[in-house]
Amino acid sequence: MLGKGGVGGGGGTKAPKPSFVSYVRPEEIHTDEKEVTEKEVTLHLLPGEQLLCEASTVLKYVQEDSCQRGVYGRLVCTDFKISFLGDEDSALDNGGEAQFKNKIIGVNDVPLHCVDQIYGVFDEKKKPLFGQLKKYPEKLVIHCKDLRVLHFCLRYTKEEEVKRIVSGIIHHTQSPKLLKRLFLFSYAAAVHGTATDSRNCTVMFDTPKDWCWELERTKGSVKYRTVSVNEGYRVSDRLPAYFVVPTPLPEDDVRRFQGHGIPIWCWSCHNGSALLKMSALPKEQDDGALQVQKSFLDGIYKTIHRPPYEMVKTEDLSSNFLSLQEIQSAYCKFKQLFLIDNSSEFWDTDIKWFSLLESSSWLDIIRRCLKKAIEITECLEAQNVNVLLLEENASDLCCLLSSLVQVMMDAHCRTRTGFQSLIQKEWVMGGHSFLDRCNHLHQSDKEEVPIFLLFLDCVWQLVHQYPPAFEFTETYLTVLSDSLYIPIFSTFFFNSPHQKDTNMGRENLDAQSKPLTLLTVWDWSVQFEPKAQTLLRNPLYVEKPKLDRGQQKGSRFKHQRQLSLPLTQSKSSPKRGFFREETDHLIKNLLGKRISKLINSSDDLQDSSREFYDSWHSKPTDYHGLLLPHIEGPEIKVWAQRYLRWIPEAQILGGGRVATMGKLLEMMEEVQSLQEKIEARHHRQEAVHAEAPGLLRNSVRLSSLFPFALLQRHSAKPVLPTSGWKALGGEDDLAKREDEFVDLGDV
């Protein structure tokens, strides 16, 4: 019914006009014809899910410039998701998408928690929608937190249905909610149990045994011990029931300020140094109270500074690092680059892509996080000193940096099970406020800060730079970021373990009823079939070979890289403010920003960290040892699979990293086949090999953003938009121009 003209290019001539122009607007299409194209599709409801409102004869637009093509169907809203029920086969022409199918969220489903902003189109003008509406839009545009943009035309829908569906979507995605009203509890009550995967070995850190196991694994049990003083959350609602502190620390000290001002263990290095975190004491104005706090902190200092403990270096993240407002502001600007309404908008912004990207500061924030993690790693690895991370509640940037350092230093955290256990330990049990930071209850936009997404982006930089070092793939990180907004898993929907345990329904249930059992996101079989799960595991990853006892004695606590570092780096320098020279700095840092602002330690380790960084990168990479990311400007890249996957124009058919991976997998399968033949000749038992994902075998037909990108169309726009040609001058002039020099400054 609608025609599309080709776009000419080249020469200095104007592009030819389309050979066919349609004079029939969508409004003139007969209703009977529309009803024929609309197919009845069954709405799949999860246990406990209820239909709230719906509208029929809704047109879902294909995101393409100047073409109002799409598919008709029903738009429904449940207490779990917004769903479009149409003819998916005509709307999607993508075999890879169907093979990597999420069993919980369909292609045309959006969880209510994933909705970021809702816009209405009135007379071709887009306006944000809030609260009660006096006039209802003819088009509905939904921006999602996973950066999808959905367009729905309501011109052919009955007026009563338009009011019902628009009001329902606005109310259920933007109105403040109570925690117990989340779909999480409805689902848990309906399923009456959990479908756990027996192969899931993720350590949950909800028992003393889990913490003791981690201490033994990292050889930290000599200097640190697990305490149960907060069992039943008698001391603090913020802390987990069990955690680890220095062995000589009295339990009375933990109780004194509800866990504030206590050094809590995160991880131990092979050389005996450890990573610790501490929350600040309550701010006091009274001199007497300040003196009490000073005496308390002085006692803590003496406890952690005497032998066998190493010297301590503090990192005050509240005053000398990123602020939450910086992160929030940067991501708000950054995400706008990918919330594209149509291909015309994409091409218009393409010419100023780099300036927009730079002005958002998101990549610079990632670089600063990686740089700070390198500095902490240098203290632990090269200088053999403990590092104490200080933050107001020790639940935001402490979680990010402590996790990032462990990913860089501990190969176990680069396995899938180890990475999931790390998130459980540092984020879930560490008291990160997922409920507030993701704004699941829509109670405070100011509290919504993507700290966890920033962490995943930092990890992706490492995965991108060192693929063989990680058992999981970037696809794993992408679906993990999507799982933040799926309210059937409890992992990312509470502010603390205490909040989760007290809202399991125990106090409100009858004596005959059982408490609710909530699912964990780590059981990936809930979301994906086994074939799809193969894309979550890196087929090029090889586990660290186990050494025999004789070899273990010779290299027990050594990294390969440590021996190549200058021996002088392990000695402390009086210029760096370690506590042996500046015994009052811990106390000053913890007594509030009023004092800590006077202490300038933002770049104390710059010189030594640079030497450590350059020395490491001059050696061959040990994928099972220490990893340091490249942090030079061009090395920090955009996580294309997550941020660009819904933009067709950003795809490369048969190109990108997926094409390279496909060829590597073909070679890997051939090597495995030859190995099996050799073993068969020697009458050995066949070895178990990792199966290369069949979805990647035809890499020529796949998109560079596989397995998420849609391949139903390709833009006919030129690589450089016409607006860019006009700005740059003629073609001859463009060919003679030199690249513009941009000073990136010091890394």
Swiss-Prot record:
Keywords: Cytoplasm, Phosphoprotein, Sarcoplasmic reticulum
Keyword Methyltransferase assigned: no
Every Myotubularin phosphatase domain range: 205-643
Family matches, as InterPro entries: MTMR12-like_C (IPR022587), MTMR12_PTP (IPR030576), Myotubularin (IPR030564), Myotubularin-like_Pase_dom (IPR010569), PH-like_dom_sf (IPR011993), Prot-tyrosine_phosphatase-like (IPR029021)
PROSITE patterns (UniProt xref): PPASE_MYOTUBULARIN
Region: Disordered, residue numbers: 548-575
Entry keyword Phosphoprotein: yes
GO cellular component: sarcomere; sarcoplasmic reticulum
Interaction with MTM1: region residues: 449-558
Ranges of Polar residues composition bias in the record: 562-572
Pfam families recorded: 3-PAP, Myotub-related
Tissues in which the protein is found: Expressed in skeletal muscles (at protein level).
Oligomeric form and interacting partners: Heterodimer with lipid phosphatase MTM1. Heterodimer with lipid phosphatase MTMR2.
Its job: Acts as an adapter for the myotubularin-related phosphatases. Regulates phosphatase MTM1 protein stability and possibly its intracellular location. By stabilizing MTM1 protein levels, required for skeletal muscle maintenance but not for myogenesis.
Protein name according to UniProt: Myotubularin-related protein 12
Organism from which the protein derives: Mus musculus (Mouse)
Gene name tied to this protein: Mtmr12
